[in-house]
Amino acid sequence: MDPEGTPGEGVGCTGWFNVEAIVERKTGDVVSEDEDDTEDTGIDLVDFIDDTCGSVQTGDEAPGALLHAQETQAHAEAVQVLKRKFVGSPAVSPLGNYNPCVDRDLSPRLNEISLNQGSGQAKRRLFLPDSGYGNTEVETSLLQVAGGGGQDVQAGGKENTRPDDGGGDATQLLRCSNLKATLLSKFKSVYGVSFSELVRSFKSDRTTCADWVVGAAGVHHSVAEGLKQLIQPFCSYAHIQCLTCDWGVYLLLLARFKCGKNRLTVSKCMSTLLNVQETHMLIEPPKLRSAAAALYWYRTGISNVSEVIGETPEWITRQTMFQHGLEDSIFDLSEMVQWAYDHDFTDDSVIAYEYAQLAGIDSNAAAFLKSNAQAKYVKDCATMCRHYKRAERQQMTMSQWIKQRCEKTDDGGDWRPIVQFLRYQGVEFIAFLAALKLFLKGIPKKNCIVLFGPPNTGKSYFGMSLIHFLQGSIISYVNSNSHFWLQPLADAKVAMLDDATPQCWSYIDNYLRNALDGNPISVDRKHKNLVQMKCPPLLITSNTNAGQDDRWMYLHSRMVVFTFEQPFPFDQNGNPVYELNDKNWKSFFSRTWSRLDLQEEEETENDGSTCRAFKCVAGQNLRTV
């Protein structure tokens, strides 16, 4: 690149461009007026820009700016309302951090001028400021209900009553955002008690219950007076209270319907009777285990503010009567054992289920359900009941036992089907009676009866029906590998071994000869010591004739064999031709009582029973107050 000031010409785009100025006038020439430089001040360009358009445009922007300012102010006020802040003096903090000060109170704007930056943190105060104008941190607004009523309901469901200028209509008064909260609040203000304290909540409208509590608002006074007569066809018990308020009559009803109903059915029924909309009613079932609720119904029922029809429900009586209250607090195991003994319940599950169902009518059962040791009580009750039953059974003779079984069996049986079945099988009835007499007495060598025959001849049907009537025990050879398979014989008056096979007969021939004799044997019991006992009469059914088989020749003299040869008959409907049940066996033993040489009891109790009634409940001493 050439140095600066080089006179040489450049080449291309970098070359120097030489222009020679054209001078038309020289120094000393006369200048004309048109070319005078002193007059060239730019005055001729004053009107070069037209300002008329600008003034017109400025006049159009003023309304827009005003509208923008108004909208901005409106938006700011809306935001302030939503944030629940005051729009007034800046000295009032939205958080309520207001400290009284003379300068601030006199001139809040002057107090805002400060050189020090104040702290924005809230300070704790011992006393809240109270200017008398009711300034609060949260801005609350009252919801005025449409209509001429005098009830204002706040957003939270609370209410403030004001004098009513005109007649109020419950239909219009209850048109609010939270209808149920309004009804509950009005109920508490009228009756002085919360509706939820008297009832328990059902989430489903289709849950069935017999007892219902109804709170209806806006009922006409004439309808409320006639409800006592209108509701009688539907209820067996009704407790009616009617109190007036600015909505009309607020009715409270506790009703026990004749059949179980759900909330929808009760709502339709009461809406028809009271001429009130279903949405204007509170319907819930009562609290059955609340002593306070039961006491409320009891106290109001005996006062003059209520009308009561029917008998008081048992859940009210049980919790309000003094005697019932004492009984509910104490559980007596002896009463439970006595109940299980009287009903012949010895199984734990049956005792627990049946006794729990008595909680509604038995105070001791109710106390049993309230206990935390129900499993222990059930186990102890079943154990004691089995002990009592076993001791009672051991003390009874066979005649007493059969007599007791006959007393517990219903009448109406016939002894003829049993005799006809024996004759159908070719069994001599007189021989059978003779063998049965010795069998029941436990005579040695006559302590076992064997029913032999081909399959489907009714051997098991005949033997099972007899054992069921005599409430005997069943043993099975399938458990012979256990040391305790003969344990049921220790608690039985009569026993049965069904379907003895050749292996079973071999086992009996090897180990149970003395059992068939009716002599004392030793039986091993689980978790207990060995017991020495006399084997009860044993009935055996088999398809093998052990009385004639030479393999078991030592058993021939120890058993009496009856052969069933004919197949068991059925009618065209599949029912047995010869019905063998407890009623027929009762008739059979009553008919053949003397032939079986069963003894009659000479001394009986006043009620005619053969044995003294067992009582395990402790005696009670009556004390006068």
Curated annotation (Swiss-Prot):
Q: A single Gene Ontology molecular function, please?
A: ATP binding
Give the GO terms filed under biological process for this record.
Answer: DNA replication
Homology family: Belongs to the papillomaviridae E1 protein family.
Name it. Replication protein E1
Where found? Host nucleus
According to its record, what are the GO cellular component terms?
Answer: host cell nucleus
Query: Region DNA-binding region: start and end of each range?
Result: 162-328
Gene3D superfamilies named in the record: 3.40.1310.10, P-loop containing nucleotide triphosphate hydrolases (3.40.50.300), Zinc finger, large T-antigen D1 domain (1.10.10.510)
Quaternary data: Can form hexamers. Interacts with E2 protein; this interaction increases E1 DNA binding specificity. Interacts with host DNA polymerase subunit POLA2. Interacts with host single stranded DNA-binding protein RPA1. Interacts with host TOP1; this interaction stimulates the enzymatic activity of TOP1.
InterPro entries membership: Helicase_SF3_DNA-vir, P-loop_NTPase, PPV_DNA_helicase_E1_C, PPV_DNA_helicase_E1_N, PPV_E1_DBD, PPV_E1_DBD_sf, Rep_E1_papillomaV, Znf_lg_T-Ag_D1_dom_sf
Record field: catalytic activity: Couples ATP hydrolysis with the unwinding of duplex DNA by translocating in the 3'-5' direction; ATP + H2O = ADP + phosphate + H(+)
Q: Which residues carry this modification: Phosphoserine?
A: 89, 93, 107
Enzyme Commission identifier(s)? 5.6.2.4
Q: Where do we find the motif Nuclear export signal here?
A: 106-115
Summarize where ATP binds, as residue positions.
453-460
| Keyword flag 4Fe-4S | no
The segments labelled Disordered in the record are 147-169
- One Pfam annotation reads PPV_E1_DBD
Reply yes or no: does the keyword Nucleotide-binding apply.
yes
- Where mainly located? host cell
**Gene source species:** Macaca mulata papillomavirus 1
The function of this protein is:
ATP-dependent DNA 3'-5' helicase required for initiation of viral DNA replication. It forms a complex with the viral E2 protein. The E1-E2 complex binds to the replication origin which contains binding sites for both proteins. During the initial step, a dimer of E1 interacts with a dimer of protein E2 leading to a complex that binds the viral origin of replication with high specificity. Then, a second dimer of E1 displaces the E2 dimer in an ATP-dependent manner to form the E1 tetramer.
Motif Nuclear localization signal, residue numbers: 83-85
Swiss-Prot/TrEMBL puts the cross-link Glycyl lysine isopeptide (Lys-Gly) (interchain with G-Cter in SUMO) at 534
Q: What is the lineage of its organism?
A: Viruses, Monodnaviria, Shotokuvirae, Cossaviricota, Papovaviricetes
Q: What keywords does the record list, in alphabetical order?
A: ATP-binding, DNA replication, DNA-binding, Early protein, Helicase, Host nucleus, Hydrolase, Isomerase, Isopeptide bond, Nucleotide-binding, Phosphoprotein, Ubl conjugation
**Ranges for domain SF3 helicase:** 427-577
